[in-house]
Amino acid sequence: MINRYFITGTDTNIGKTISVCALLQYLNKLGNKSVGCKLISSGCKKIKNKIFNEDVVNIMKYNNIKFKYKDINPFAFLEKTAPHIASKRKNIFINHILLSNKLNKFLNYDIDYLIIEGFGGWKVPINSNSMYSEWVSNEKLPIILVVGIKLGCINHALLTIESIKNSNAIILGWIANHLEKDLINKNDYFKYLKKVIKYPLIGKIPFIKNKKNFSNLHKYIFLKKVI
């Protein structure tokens, strides 16, 4: 049976992708067959009539089972906006059934861990009537919350956790991702979050200057606390 984790964040551009890459590297080091995917992406680039998302390309570097791009990122949009807007403008209707069908394709493969990167924060509409978070809850996907350490992160983290709990979703743990090198009081923010978040801290990623080099991130993950 595949162990499936869903990675959400306290906001967009908060470090979900770097966290997925770190988790994949950690799991690979333990000898697991690990795959990361991002079902929906926007802000993509078009190269030779093919659409690619930079986050997805980074994730695919650390998949030790190889898939075609369209399997890892079935819904990719050029416009950098919310899924319900981008998909409507392309006359593509995304719903829960479609997402489940795309996810279930991985069940046909010998995979130990499937890491699913979400889109933006927790509450994101995929069409005019449905939220991404509702699908995650229905699929009973254990959630790893990425908290970007910055001014306002305490409020963002606690509100997101409250919303996830109200959705009857399962929180596996959280990852602290440092977004700014010289953030004032960053250690105080982290210490407070560690005290008030009643879920295991499974990763602490320092500020990474080179956003194109996600290697050697496994050392910042301690997932063994919860698996």
UniProtKB/Swiss-Prot annotation:
Its cofactor is Mg(2+). Pathway: Cofactor biosynthesis; biotin biosynthesis; biotin from 7,8-diaminononanoate: step 1/2. One of its GO terms (cellular component) is cytosol. Coiled coil: none annotated. The active site is at residue 38. InterPro entries: DTB_synth_BioD, P-loop_NTPase. Keywords: ATP-binding, Biotin biosynthesis, Cytoplasm, Ligase, Magnesium, Metal-binding, Nucleotide-binding. It comes from the Bacteria. Mg(2+) binds at residues 17, 55, 117. It catalyses: (7R,8S)-7,8-diammoniononanoate + CO2 + ATP = (4R,5S)-dethiobiotin + ADP + phosphate + 3 H(+). ATP binds at residues 13-18, 55, 117-120, 177-178, 206-208, 213. It is found in: Cytoplasm. It holds the Pfam family AAA_26. GO terms for biological process: biotin biosynthetic process. It is an enzyme of class 6 (ligase). Substrate binds at residue 42. GO terms for molecular function: ATP binding; dethiobiotin synthase activity; magnesium ion binding. Gene3D superfamilies: P-loop containing nucleotide triphosphate hydrolases. Its EC number is 6.3.3.3. HAMAP family: BioD (MF_00336). Belongs to the dethiobiotin synthetase family. Catalyzes a mechanistically unusual reaction, the ATP-dependent insertion of CO2 between the N7 and N8 nitrogen atoms of 7,8-diaminopelargonic acid (DAPA, also called 7,8-diammoniononanoate) to form a ureido ring. PANTHER family: DETHIOBIOTIN SYNTHETASE. NCBIfam families: bioD. This is ATP-dependent dethiobiotin synthetase BioD. It comes from Wigglesworthia glossinidia brevipalpis.
